[in-house]
Amino acid sequence: MPKLLTIAIPTYNRAELLNKQLAWLAQAIKGFEDDCEILVSDNCSTDNTQEVIQKWQATLNNITFKSNKNSKNLGVVKNIMYCLNSATTKYVWTIGDDDPIQDRAVAYVISKLRGHEDLSLLFLNFSGRNQITGEAVHPPTIVGNRWFDIDSEDADGDGKAIFEHCFSKSVGAVIFLTATVYRTDLVKRALQIWPDAENNWISLAYLAGYCAANGGVIVTKETYLECVVGVSYWQKEPKSALLMQYKHIPEVILKLQENGYSKQFCRRMLLQNGKEVNWKVFLGALRRWPMSAIKTVVPFVALVSLCAFDVMVSKELKLAESSEISSQEMRSYEP
């Protein structure tokens, strides 16, 4: 009989942090050994990551502990996708090797997975902290230091509507890896539908949206972990901000529309993204990589312009329909 949950850790050249995270997991998982499997996927590290994995495999010999070492560095997103595709349990929870998680999180997750047979997605609320200043960080549209502002712990709401709310409030919230537990069969199906998701840094939003549209969703009110802002893998990539804002987010929105989300919602999200992009990012990229920047931004501008035109036409049609109805009503009252 398959176990309930795979807790997967993708890692690369962070042996010390991995050791600390596995030490946390060894304590947090006590009492749930029969429900869980552990998977560590090493993205071809050159430090002593393998020694750390072997040490903890020997220590945690009462639980299924799988490990993988890629023959080359696949990049962080592909390593995450490997973890998701390799899970054989009903649910998969892929966690960062450096994210601070509360001890009670594992027990909470297991209890919710056991209690809701049709659950397809679980978001653990989290707080944010700036790595340099230590100051609290959270979306400006949300009050208090948390990243989700919807309370949905009974899993009986409209999963699609819950995801739409969360996504519209904060893209960052729905792509925070450690905050998300997916139902394995759904996340694998989503990856089969869009194989190129592994080349999109925002694709975790698509995976969450797909799962949300196909079952129950839980979003916790309390926070169970912390996101340290300023250490993300994509922030180290030179073109990351340009690609994420002008290419990857629009791609995800279009994929959501292809997989059941309304045209109205996706159009609204594209227009919202058009308002929120930082044009300084484009201007900076234009100086450094002119051709690449232009090739990235021109399709984005065309897409947002098309959405804006579509909205204008819809408003004109509604206005015309309203005027026609009013005229008919006036004629009906004529003597």
Question: What are the roles of these predicted feature ranges?
Answer:
Residues 222-225, 236-265, 285:
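Catalytic core of nucleotide-sugar-dependent glycosyltransferases
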Residues 160-164, 188, 250-254, 266-267, ...:
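Generic detector of well-ordered alpha-helical segments enriched in charged/polar residues
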Residues 54, 58, 147-149, 168, ...:
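Generic surface-pattern signal
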Residues 45, 238-244, 258, 270-274, ...:
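Non-membrane alpha-helical secondary structure
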Residues 1-241:
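Nucleotide-sugar donor-binding/catalytic module of glycosyltransferases
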Residues 124-126, 222-224, 263-276:
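Acidic carboxylate-rich catalytic motifs and surrounding loops in phosphoryl-/glycosyl-chemistry enzymes
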